[in-house]
């Protein structure tokens, strides 16, 4: 960490390489300790709640899970929901599901909802959500197949990697890139300063 910033111990409770890169861009020192919670089981149990509430709940559960083992650290956790017509598009995990997701989203508007929280000693200190709205071009079968072969975005909600070639799939985007990628940086920076986790 540079001399410009003074900080308390921080953990990012995420296995996402993109969130890791976004955090690194802030110049912070932090540990990466992914949560062991079962996201799919939690989503099934909370399938009747509002989608934003579901995202916040998932972020909180991840942070609280890690906080039990690291009480001295401030835990940052996040969750990302890709939503169209009140349906959540989870990580496709395989090629055929990714094809299906892009077919369904083709030519339509959908939302990427980024949910964040900060926890210390199993207490929730801050929570936040931000939404980006994206509209895909009408995608041909050939385009879908070629894109998926190029990036294999099977671990990405919505079956695209916006940080890479995925940008070419869209005709309109409203919202910040870091929100689309799952870690809205300015709200997080302000929260860390306000909570005195980071000083300048």
Curated annotation (Swiss-Prot):
Q: Which Pfam families match?
A: Maf
Give the record's GO biological process terms: nucleotide metabolic process
Listed cofactors: a divalent metal cation
User: Got any disulfides in this one, which pairs?
Assistant: none
> Gene3D superfamilies of this UniProt entry?
3.90.950.10
The EC number(s) attached to this protein equal 3.6.1.9
Q: What class of enzyme is it?
A: hydrolase
Of the GO CC terms on this record, one is: cytoplasm
Main localization is cytoplasm
Question: So where's the catalytic machinery, residue-wise?
Answer: 79 (proton acceptor)
Q: Name the reaction it catalyses.
A: a ribonucleoside 5'-triphosphate + H2O = a ribonucleoside 5'-phosphate + diphosphate + H(+); a 2'-deoxyribonucleoside 5'-triphosphate + H2O = a 2'-deoxyribonucleoside 5'-phosphate + diphosphate + H(+)
Is this entry keyworded Nucleus? no
Q: Where in the cell is it found?
A: Cytoplasm
UniProt cross-references to InterPro entries, sorted A to Z: ITPase-like_fam (IPR029001), Maf-like (IPR003697)
UniProt keywords (A-Z) are: Cytoplasm, Hydrolase, Nucleotide metabolism
**Source species, domain of life:** Bacteria
Picking any one GO molecular function of the record gives: nucleoside triphosphate diphosphatase activity
The record's similarity note reads: Belongs to the Maf family.
Its job? Nucleoside triphosphate pyrophosphatase. May have a dual role in cell division arrest and in preventing the incorporation of modified nucleotides into cellular nucleic acids.
Supply the PANTHER family for this chain: BIFUNCTIONAL DTTP/UTP PYROPHOSPHATASE/METHYLTRANSFERASE PROTEIN-RELATED, BIFUNCTIONAL DTTP_UTP PYROPHOSPHATASE_METHYLTRANSFERASE PROTEIN-RELATED
User: By what name is this protein known?
Assistant: Nucleoside triphosphate pyrophosphatase
**Species this chain originates from:** Legionella pneumophila subsp. pneumophila (strain Philadelphia 1 / ATCC 33152 / DSM 7513)
């Amino acid at each position: 960490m540079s001399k410009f910033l003074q900080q308390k111990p921080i953990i990012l409770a995420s296995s996402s390489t993109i969130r890791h890169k976004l955090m690194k861009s802030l110049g912070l020192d932090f540990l990466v300790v992914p949560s062991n919670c079962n996201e799919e089981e939690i989503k099934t149990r909370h399938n009747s709640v509002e989608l934003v509430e579901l995202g916040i709940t998932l972020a909180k559960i991840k942070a609280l899970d890690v906080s039990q083992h690291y009480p001295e650290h401030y835990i940052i956790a996040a969750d990302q929901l890709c939503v169209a017509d009140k349906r959540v598009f989870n990580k496709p995990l395989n090629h055929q599901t990714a094809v299906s997701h892009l077919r369904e989203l083709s030519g339509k508007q959908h939302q990427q909802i980024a949910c964040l929280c900060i926890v210390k000693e199993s207490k929730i200190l801050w929570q936040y959500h931000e939404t980006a709205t994206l509209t895909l071009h009408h995608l041909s079968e050939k385009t879908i197949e070629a894109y998926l072969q190029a990036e294999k975005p099977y671990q990405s909600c919505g079956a695209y990697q916006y940080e890479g070639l995925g940008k070419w799939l869209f005709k309109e985007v409203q919202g910040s890139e870091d929100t689309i990628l799952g870690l809205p940086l300015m709200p997080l920076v302000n929260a860390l300063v306000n909570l005195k986790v980071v000083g300048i």
